[in-house]
Amino acid sequence: MTKTKRVAAMMMAAAMGTSMIGVIPAAAEEERETLKLALTQSSMVTDYENNYFTKYLEDKLNINIEFYMLPADAAETRTKVNLMATSNEDLPDVMITDGHLTNEMILQLGDSGFFAPLNDYLNDPEVMPNFNAIPDEDREDILQATTMADGNIYGFAAYEPETWNLTPNRMFINRAWLDKLGLEVPTTTDELKTVLEAFRDGDPNGNGVQDEIGVYGFAGGSYGENTVDALMNAFIFWNGGLSLSDDGTEVIAPFTQDAWREGLTYMNDLYNEGLLSANIFTDDGQQFKAILNQETPIVGLTTAGSLSNWPDVKNNKNFAEMEMIEPLKGPEGVQYTPYNPYVPGQEMYIINGTDKLDLALKFADEFFNIDTGLIERFGEEGVDWTRDPKDLEGQTNAYVEAGLYDKLSMLVISTIWSDNQSQTWRNHGPRYASLEMGNTVYDYSSGNKFDVNDPTQLNAKSYEMYYPKHPENVLPALKYTLEETETIQEQLTTLPTFVDQCMAEFITGARSLDDAGWNAYLDELETMGLSTWLETAQVAYDRTK
């Protein structure tokens, strides 16, 4: 018998104050309860009703899912959710927003009573057995990351760390130029300057023109392209914002420290010697890629998180000359890299007051089942992915080849992630996948086995070179109260922009690094409210201990 469902734009109805008539299940399915789910849609999912993952959940939990689609756009989703909370009519039981809600919005919706607090349920193995089966350390990370400033947890999280994304400022040097000039790979900032001088003066690209760019990057890039950030980490840990003291007790502003000034002095010297391009601060992403891919290679050193900056990377002659190197050591032995600590994203919420609370909790907990999580992310087992030992035989990946893991856990065997499909919800929803699970997957959808000689297979090398290069104590994502957010709202916007601007000005000489210039900079930061930001951040950090 055909199943009857409704896929409705509930948010629009809520905005107009209209009611929505419930669906009467087919007679043969009357024993099944119906769960109303508001779900952020994906343009790449062609059908949610006749969808493999939908049917998997319905059959396993013996339920009917009634969909209310939220927009794919994050801003539109936030608007719709606010309208729903305001109208308080035709509410779903559960909501999945694909991480589109900000921490401030989650706290506000929880504080107002729209989202149900989840603390007691998450900590009860009888209510959420799958969640409580997560290894203790990972489960504690999830609980800590999702605890809001009021002490409550309102969202079920997706936990699926990938080391490649944690350290995107990977440094690449032109190895062909090093070889031509008889130079070794630099390991320190002083050695780098010597190499850059040789690049400048030795015509390593062989075109008879002094067109070589020593250090190049894209300061406006969001995925590792800001080379000056990478260089600063040879002097002090810089992650793009506030950080922690060495002992992990105090929130500090690294951009006010003496070591920061020393890093600026080093890069200003490179700039004055013609070894660091000022275009780092003015070029956009398109120009960045164009410079990296000139007919005659002209870049000596850059940083990038994605190899897509070199189109057709396996056959790209510019990339063929580059080699990824370790973060550089500074004069005091500092050797860090910008590091984005993994933060589990809040994905699913239960609407407070639902009369299907037990079912909603059962539904949420199912997403933390390992098999369900694999289907949620990769599709149908045996069709889109496999963990059959016979299929895994003879297969490997970069992490296994590097000896970091003994064997693969699964193979991806379809192009489901890049195709329009009705197999999954595109990984929208909570999920648990350990770091090992993520690192022991190989994408075999092309039918090509892992090639140990493929120069683009850098995941394991990046893991070894970059993942350990951060301080023991790293400032977590802070959860501010509504009052705290109001207090520092201006500082959160203006101060990071000002620091980036001054960084460029100090390096290019537009601002002086003498005592007068440095003190003027510190005074400006104070006038803009740095102390207020630090004090508020300290209070928020202390709540996490």
Please state what every model-predicted region is:
Residues G220-G241, S245, N268-Y432:
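Extracytoplasmic/periplasmic substrate-binding proteins
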Residues T372-E505:
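Conserved small-residue motifs centered on glycine
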Residues M1-K3:
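N-terminal secretory signal peptides that target proteins for export/translocation
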Residues E49-F53, W260-L264, N268, P331-V334:
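Structured alpha-helical segments in the cores of large, soluble enzyme domains
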Residues E31-L35, L61-E66, N88-D93, G113-A116, ...:
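Loop/turn elements at helix/coil->beta-strand transitions in domains of secreted/extracellular proteins
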Residues R6-A9, G17, I21-M171, R175-L192, ...:
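Conserved N-terminal structural module of periplasmic/extracytoplasmic solute-binding proteins
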Residues I106, D111-A145, L196-F199, N207-G241, ...:
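Carboxylate/His-rich catalytic cores and anion/metal-binding grooves
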Residues N119, M148-N226, S245-Q287, I291-Q294, ...:
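Helix-loop-helix "hinge/cap" segment bordering the ligand-binding cleft or interdomain interface
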